[in-house]
Curated annotation (Swiss-Prot):
Keywords: Cell membrane, Membrane, Transmembrane, Transmembrane helix. This is UPF0391 membrane protein Patl_4137. InterPro entries: DUF1328. HAMAP family: UPF0391.
Amino acid sequence: MLGWALTFLIIAILAGVMGFGGIAGTAAGIAKIIFFVFLVLLVLSLVANAIRGKGPKV
């Protein structure tokens, strides 16, 4: 039980440092870029499978 308390304490400290240190805004910007990159890759994959005549696996 003490191990879990220490683990969550460390996680809380790291979250506080990232949140108050300005890293959160940068991380959010990077996450948006990665989201759109993978969205484009998804669309390309769907188009490529449609051209080949393969349907999505269900």
